[in-house]
């Protein structure tokens, strides 16, 4: 988490291990997110922005703004499955007042629209920051669940090459996905393994892992 990934080797491994329709997501902050995105512009598609409940970067507060967001870069070779997680808004019925002629769209007739209040998601995701952590950059389980539901079907495999505290594995268990996780740091491997074990037990008993 504190050492940049070797990008050429990373992308070689991604193309070998991930099917062309698989989505590849990375959490990253400036300036590394720019380096990461530029390292594979052919696969870079767009980004989500995680809006945190707590700021970070207090040691640099007199030199730079506190960090309230973190970017999530999305890469893929071919379009992956995409299941937008709809947000609930206010239902409405709308009728255009009259027919007309637009220089951009030509002639149009009076039409009506109706919505049950469901809205397509924007790219800013507000999830509370984890307060009690195993890993310094631990992500919220709910945020990882959101991303897993967006890009995978139940029963599919989710992989995390920087597993840290095991949040991705817990989120995969909670959403009915399988997982493959990698972590090389002994300080995190043990606690993550125990956390995943507890999550398995929770899911097996009808609860959610934490």
Q: What are the residue ranges of the model-derived segments?
A:
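Short, conserved SAM-binding/catalytic segment
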Residues: 193-206
């Amino acid at each position: 988490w504190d050492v940049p990934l070797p990008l050429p080797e990373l992308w070689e491994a991604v193309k070998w291990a991930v099917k062309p329709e698989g989505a590849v997501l990375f959490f990253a902050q400036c300036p590394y997110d720019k380096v990461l995105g530029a390292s594979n512009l052919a696969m870079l598609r767009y980004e989500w922005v995680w809006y945190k409940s707590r700021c970070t970067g207090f040691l640099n507060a007199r030199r730079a703004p506190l960090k309230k967001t973190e970017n999530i870069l999305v890469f893929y070779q071919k379009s992956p499955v995409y299941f937008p997680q709809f947000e609930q808004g206010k239902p409405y019925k709308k009728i255009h007042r009259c027919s007309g002629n637009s220089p951009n769209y030509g002639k149009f007739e009076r039409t009506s629209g109706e919505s049950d209040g469901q809205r397509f998601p924007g790219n800013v995701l507000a999830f509370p920051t984890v307060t009690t952590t195993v890993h310094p950059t631990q992500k919220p389980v709910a945020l990882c669940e959101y991303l897993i539901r967006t890009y995978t079907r139940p029963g599919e495999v989710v992989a995390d090459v920087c597993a840290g505290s095991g949040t991705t594995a817990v989120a995969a268990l909670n959403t009915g996905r399988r997982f493959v996780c990698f972590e090389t740091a002994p300080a995190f491997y043990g606690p993550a393994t125990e956390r995943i074990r507890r999550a398995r037990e929770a899911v097996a008993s009808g609860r959610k892992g934490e």
